[in-house]
Amino acid sequence: IAMLFWQRNQLAIHCSAVEHDGNALIIAGDSGSGKSTLTTKLLENGFRLMTDDVAIVDISAQDNVIVYPAFPQQKLCRDAVHRNHLNTEDLLYIDEDRDKFAVPRRDCFCESPCKLSAMLCLSVQNEDSDVLLTELNGHQKLISFLENNFLFPMFRNSGGFCTEDMQKCLQTVQTLPLYRMMRPFGIDSTDIQLQKIQKIIFHSEEDN
């Protein structure tokens, strides 16, 4: 399916996506990096959910990249469900391997496609470290963008992107702000993460 989207100049990106004032932010990262936890924090502060696991991104016009909404549902692991004071008996159990539940988000869901304003890649570092949010440039920016594309493993195993495909990605990242956020392991730093996103990415220090 991801290949069909690619042929239509649309990418399937492994990420969450939220909307704020008509602009979309996609949140990518490895399993355990804190995507769902950060997304939940953003939803509690005025952002709206667009997608929880996969975002379809239209790159046909590189200066106006569009994110499409998916389903009004978020997948949360058991400890996140308890932290948000939700009753597991009211939720659908959907993943035995990772012990996850489906949480309805109809009350804070964005149903319309939105312009992609930025991409955020999460990673975890030592527990005594600070939360760091930095903008990526050059080669690092392109690699981070490619690595979160669902087709990246296939292209890598087949010898890499062809010239035309690589050009699509290059043109997209030239105009797309891309950030890396590093958070400490084992510590709830979502308040600080929220503040940095509001200040650096959305240029606002006010809570919504």
Model-derived segments and spans:
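Glycine-rich, often acidic-flanked micro-motifs
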Residues: 16-30, 44-50, 54-208
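Conserved glycine(s) of the Walker
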Residues: 33-34
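Extreme N-terminal, non-catalytic leader segments
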Residues: 1-22
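Post-Walker A alpha-helix
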Residues: 38-39
